[in-house]
Amino acid sequence: MNRRRRIYEGKAKILYEGPEPGTLVQFFKDDATAFNAKKHEVIDGKGVLNNRISEHIFTQLNRIGIPTHFIRRLNMREQLIKEVEIIPLEVVVRNVAAGSLAKHLGLEEGTILPRSIIEFYYKADALDDPMVTEEHITAFGWASPQEIDDIMALAIRVNDFLTGLFLGIGIQLVDFKMECGRLWEGDMMRIVVADEISPDSARLWDITTNDKLDKDRFRRDMGGLVEAYQEVARRLGIMNENDTPRPSGPTLVK
């Protein structure tokens, strides 16, 4: 039996060597973490749901011309992706005050922001991913000014698309986190959306009830995380309406 070479393991995913040069296999784990892994639990079925939801979103992004690393889903937990050079930044786009923004600026959670706000955080778990400015990014060489412009343009386009996508299924996109990477194609390089977009990396509230359908259910000990992710999958049309939560994990539409 061939054993794949493990390239990298993060808190929620594992990257393996891909079948072709320039590709990787991204495996979604069931691990739920918060506060940079200070809180950790394994929740059966979470990885399956995140794989399918992220696949659905990245497929749509590719379709409308927003470049991503996604190629195709391989199975319930894995997807084939293009190998990129990850830029060590988390890009957060906020539409509604919640989480750290509400806390740091004394805003009531749920306050609609005057306009969408883009923030950058340096990816360093040991430092709790500190917020950084464009000056920090260029001074330390994490990205060039042109790359920052490209990242911000991608963030705005992704936010516009996701806002409309979720609004159409009765969900408010409060905020989301995305990562970007450098994709080399011969001598040419372009910035693409990488990692994942799922309820793990976005705050999603039911428009009518304000019920949280995202990882805040784990962060805040609310329970019902898999059921919330299942609800997002159902509304997106990638999960059967009559499926019910089971310890062995959810059943998804193939």
UniProtKB/Swiss-Prot annotation:
Enzyme class: ligase
InterPro entries the record matches: SAICAR_synt/ADE2_N (IPR028923), SAICAR_synt_PurC (IPR033934), SAICAR_synth (IPR001636), SAICAR_synthetase (IPR050089), SAICAR_synthetase_CS (IPR018236)
GO cellular component terms, semicolon-separated: cytosol
Pathway: Purine metabolism; IMP biosynthesis via de novo pathway; 5-amino-1-(5-phospho-D-ribosyl)imidazole-4-carboxamide from 5-amino-1-(5-phospho-D-ribosyl)imidazole-4-carboxylate: step 1/2
An example Gene Ontology molecular-function term: ATP binding
CDD domains membership: SAICAR_synt_PurC (cd01415)
Pfam families, alphabetized: SAICAR_synt
Coiled coil: none
GO terms classed as biological process: 'de novo' IMP biosynthetic process; cobalamin biosynthetic process
Keyword set, alphabetical order: ATP-binding, Ligase, Nucleotide-binding, Purine biosynthesis
SUPFAM superfamilies reported in the protein's UniProt record: SAICAR synthase-like (SSF56104)
EC number(s) from the headed UniProt entry: 6.3.2.6
Reaction catalysis annotation: 5-amino-1-(5-phospho-D-ribosyl)imidazole-4-carboxylate + L-aspartate + ATP = (2S)-2-[5-amino-1-(5-phospho-beta-D-ribosyl)imidazole-4-carboxamido]succinate + ADP + phosphate + 2 H(+)
Protein family membership: Belongs to the SAICAR synthetase family.
Protein known as: Phosphoribosylaminoimidazole-succinocarboxamide synthase
Organism: Brucella melitensis biotype 2 (strain ATCC 23457)
